[in-house]
Amino acid sequence: MNTIEKIRLDPITRIEGEITLPGSKSLSNRALLLAALAKGTTRVTNLLVSDDVEHMLNALQTLGIRYTLSQDKRECIVEGACGALAWQNGLSLFLGNAGTVMRPLAAVLCLKGEVRAEVVLTGEARMQQRPIQHLVDALRQAGANIEYLENQGYPPLAIKNTGLIGGKIQIDGSISSQFLTALLMVAPLAESDMQIEIVGDLVSKPYIDMTLAMMRDFGVVVQNNNYQSFFVQAQQCYLSPGQYWVEGDASSASYFLAAAAIKGKVKVNGIGKNSIQGDRLFADVLAKMGANISWGEDFIQAEKSVLRGIDVDLNHIPDAAITIAIVALFAETETIIRNVYNWRVKETDRLSAMATELRKLGATVEEGQDFIRIQPLALTDFETAEIETYNDHRIAMCFSLIALSNTAVTILDPQCTRKTFPNYFAEFEKLWRKN
């Protein structure tokens, strides 16, 4: 594979056109796992082609799930196991830096298997720095047999398939909604009903709504008591819906919508007003900043206007929120993004990384423990910079928008976008209009 060390983006006069989004990473990996656990065969369409989805597919295959993947990898026919997965004792699964694989699999692999076996879940160095203790603590309350192999609270994990009893479980929701998602997805397969109580403030609630909607699509209804507790009936089997279409990735939509709000007009296809993804709300934040936004059943359109800074809590859309930090540079007044501590436990510490890279461009930035304050720049005041991407796909993509200033920008390691959007830069370039 050819490695591209950097990509230089020269100033872009205008952005204009249409883009059709690749499938959502979060939906793709949830759909594959639910299909694997379900009774029946599921055809998953508009699957995202990316590193993270490949990690899920490889793991499921190793765990005995049969599937047929189309030549373009966008459609997968999954034969469900109707319950616990099976593997040879001593198995080790390498899951890269894919949180949407590590967290739910850690829960599912605790289920009682016909043959007792142990599995090790491991990943890249960064994965071993991403906390998982809140999930492990909750699973242990339900009877799980999980051990940390290196650092307490972090992968790699050793898991034995001795079963999940269920019962009353407390889980801390303050760091990542993926922990609750993992627990919810496995709860119907536990031995007794599960009452899940949330400790602390639950972050990224729209991602929980997405999980609950998908569980409904696969035949399981969860009782949600105002996000304070959840009740799940045990000894169920997910039921295949036959076909599951994966919506376009709302987080990936943010770059194109933001580009249009700064300098043009773009119609983003593949996600619309009825999307189950919380990151669709990114468009509402742009609208509050002054962008012209219009919605359809299967599209969102953004058009340039005068942008104002904003003081906003973006806890509910943490992945799309970092794009607002770039839009802030093009606004007329300062922007404060609040309640985003969980940026620090993403693919990199995004609060620190964003502050560092924004300052390279000449921006005045204040980095707090859970907020970032950004002063705007005139189009002519951006400094030429090489942007370090920290092996974080979202940093690479959002900093591409700096080319909408009067200054070129260089993105290091642009291929890190393989995690969710391998051909992002090619798609972005199709919308460029230059003098």
UniProtKB/Swiss-Prot annotation:
Keyword Nuclease: no
GO process terms (BP): amino acid biosynthetic process; aromatic amino acid family biosynthetic process; chorismate biosynthetic process
Protein keywords: Amino-acid biosynthesis, Aromatic amino acid biosynthesis, Cytoplasm, Transferase
The keyword Cell membrane is assigned to this record: no
Catalytic activity field: 3-phosphoshikimate + phosphoenolpyruvate = 5-O-(1-carboxyvinyl)-3-phosphoshikimate + phosphate
Record EC number: 2.5.1.19
Catalytic residues of the enzyme: 319
Superkingdom of the source species: Bacteria
EC category: transferase
List of residues binding 3-phosphoshikimate: 25-26, 30, 176-178, 204, 319, 342, 346
Associated pathway: Metabolic intermediate biosynthesis; chorismate biosynthesis; chorismate from D-erythrose 4-phosphate and phosphoenolpyruvate: step 6/7
Subunit structure: Monomer.
Free-text function comment from the UniProt entry: Catalyzes the transfer of the enolpyruvyl moiety of phosphoenolpyruvate (PEP) to the 5-hydroxyl of shikimate-3-phosphate (S3P) to produce enolpyruvyl shikimate-3-phosphate and inorganic phosphate.
HAMAP family registered for this protein in UniProt: EPSP_synth (MF_00210)
Name this polypeptide is given: 3-phosphoshikimate 1-carboxyvinyltransferase
Organism the protein comes from: Haemophilus ducreyi (strain 35000HP / ATCC 700724)
Gene symbol of the encoding locus: aroA
